[in-house]
């Protein structure tokens, strides 16, 4: 069984944000397994993209446990998400990228006619089912300071100064001009 996973973007044969994924992978292993011995792999060395996929947009999924990994490659088409259904869940915990997404899937099923959900925890906006959220107000982009998962794309955009953290309550959502999903496959 693989309790954790990473999703990486490979665009035209180049792995995106590999260093941030490596850091999160190692941190997640240590947090999940505590003081138990773990085998840490170099993710870059593990990825062997098949030649027919070299010039495509690829979603690479690495499932892992304390001793081994399993890698899968999928062609990917970016989507535009226009509508978000707020769903309240005060007891959700997703600080690690868990393979068991049953609670997230249950919440996603509540989206109704919307494209995606917006998870509200203790009155604050957190994430959606597949990534972090960013909110545009005028020319500035903000991301909730209460994410469920510290995403690698979110971290990259924060480091670059392209987005800023702030508390976003559910009632604040109407004050923004645009909402976007960011994750390994979708940047700003």
UniProtKB/Swiss-Prot annotation:
Source taxonomy: Bacteria, Pseudomonadati, Pseudomonadota, Gammaproteobacteria, Pasteurellales
Pfam families: Aminotran_4
Protein name: Uncharacterized protein HI_1169
Single GO molecular function: catalytic activity
Domain of life (superkingdom): Bacteria
